[in-house]
Structures are given as structure tokens and as C-alpha cells.
A protein has these predicted regions:
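Short, basic-rich loop-to-helix N-cap that marks the start of a DNA-contacting helix
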Residues: 38-53
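Alpha-helical hairpin
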Residues: 23-26, 43, 57
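A short, Lys/Arg-rich alpha-helix, primarily the initiator
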Residues: 1-22
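A generic structural signal for short
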Residues: 5, 35-37
Length: 73
């Protein structure tokens, strides 16, 4: 089964790579948390808030950044 880092949208993977160059500690924290699980509901709020701040992820769309094939209802 794939972990969340593997299912992350390509544009966000690129942003995460750029973040790794400027803020390596923050990027490693996000990467570690996303690699640790395959369930989006297991991601901590701290990780979600960090992704919102540094990667521009909208918390309302958080589930959809891992499941791009799922249509919003």
C-alpha cells in the first residue's frame, strides 16, 4: 500500500522539494509524517497546518491533495 507522500499531487511534491532547500527541518517533518501513514485521517493537525503555511494547501481541500481522482460533491 502506498503512503501519503507517494500519493501527493506532483505540484505539491515540487513545492516540498523547494521547501527542503530553504527550510530542511520543516520539510523533513512533513515528509516523515506523510511517509508514516497511508490514511489521511491519521495526519496530525500540526502537519496539516505546516503544509497550509509552507505549501499553500487549503485545509478544506486537504483530502483531495492525496486523492486527485475523487470528485468533490
Amino acid at each position: 500500500m502506498k503512503n501519503l507522500l507517494q500519493t501527493l499531487r506532483p505540484d505539491l511534491k515540487d513545492k516540498l522539494s523547494l521547501l527542503n532547500e530553504e527550510y530542511p527541518f520543516t520539510a523533513h517533518r512533513i515528509i516523515k509524517d506523510l511517509e508514516a501513514t497511508d490514511n489521511v485521517f491519521d495526519v496530525t493537525f500540526l502537519t496539516m497546518a505546516t503544509m497550509q503555511k509552507f505549501l499553500g494547501v487549503n485545509l478544506d481541500d486537504f483530502y483531495f491533495i492525496f486523492e486527485p481522482d475523487v470528485e468533490r460533491g
